[in-house]
Design a protein with these regions (language model features):
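Non-heme di-metal
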Residues: 2-276
């Protein structure tokens, strides 16, 4: 099966990998709309995605810069050409989000000042690491996940029924463009020749992006209930002066630790191991 996919092209390989996690992405995204206050949930979603739209062009430029540093690399020229086109296509998308937030009565500047969520920070930071440490072609895996399943017409109509036409520019414009962008990525991959390492890296980039997207949707679906639960778990958080974003991270770490055996009592001073 793997040999058949590779023979069909790198685009087909990546499509098959993304298909493995698409059901989880769809379920996670649909949970957000179960919120008893769906308009507020939509505003949280736009605010959470705002850092992604702001980061898109700088990230694409970083990948293109890495391509231009290695003109002898046979992947550099076609990849740099794609990135140049995509930079033009992605410009101004953050303004769509700002306009939609304003139409919902939310201050766009508040979204700009807010720290990005842990899920978004991890998603974007991972791409910089993969581009710098592996190859800029890895960014195609991330973009493929984000742009190969555009907002459905059902979702757009649902938001319009809840909030009117005003705050739907982000969804409607991405619905019109993202399917085409996704097809362009898979077509480009079909023209590229990747070795086993880069094929795995592109797949890793895509699957890690999906993992972070599911985490983001879960954060949004939990909403304020999550914050209340965290406050109960960590009653000293107010004394420590933690913000909501910091509190979410501490609670996540504590929850992860709670699922592990208590080995510290048996290991004495055999702890640590981090370094820079």
């Amino acid at each position: 099966m793997a040999q058949q996919l590779t023979a069909a092209g790198e685009g087909a390989v990546l499509r098959a990998k993304i298909a493995l996690v698409r059901p989880a992405l769809d379920i996670a995204s649909s949970r957000m709309w179960l919120d008893p206050e769906p308009v507020a949930a939509y505003a949280r979603y736009l605010a959470a995605m705002y850092p992604v739209t702001r980061a898109a062009v700088p990230l694409l430029k970083f990948a293109r810069q890495r391509c231009l540093r290695h003109p002898a690399d046979p992947l550099s020229r076609p990849l740099a050409a794609f990135l140049t086109r995509h930079i033009r296509a992605e410009r101004g998308h953050d303004r769509w989000v700002r306009a939609d937030l304003a139409a919902l009565g939310t201050d766009p500047d508040e979204a700009a000042r807010a720290l990005p969520s842990a899920a978004v920070t991890g998603l974007l930071g991972a791409q910089y690491q993969l581009i710098a440490a592996v190859h800029p072609v890895t960014l195609l895996g991330c973009i493929a996940v984000l742009e190969s399943a555009p907002p459905s017409q059902g979702l757009i109509e649902h938001v319009r029924a809840l909030a009117g036409d005003g705050p739907t520019a982000t969804l409607t414009r991405h619905a019109a463009s993202d399917a085409r962008h996704g097809d362009e990525i898979f077509a480009l991959l079909d023209r590229l020749r990747l070795d086993a390492r880069l094929r795995a890296a592109v797949g890793f980039s895509a699957l890690f992006t999906a993992r972070q997207a599911v985490a983001l949707f879960d954060e949004l679906a939990d909403g304020t209930a999550l914050s209340r639960r965290e406050a109960q778990v960590l009653p000293g958080s107010a004394v420590a002066g933690l913000t909501a974003a910091e509190l979410a991270l501490v609670a996540e770490i504590e929850n992860a630790r709670g699922g592990l055996p208590d080995v510290v009592a048996h290991s004495g001073d055999i702890v640590g191991g981090l370094f820079l």
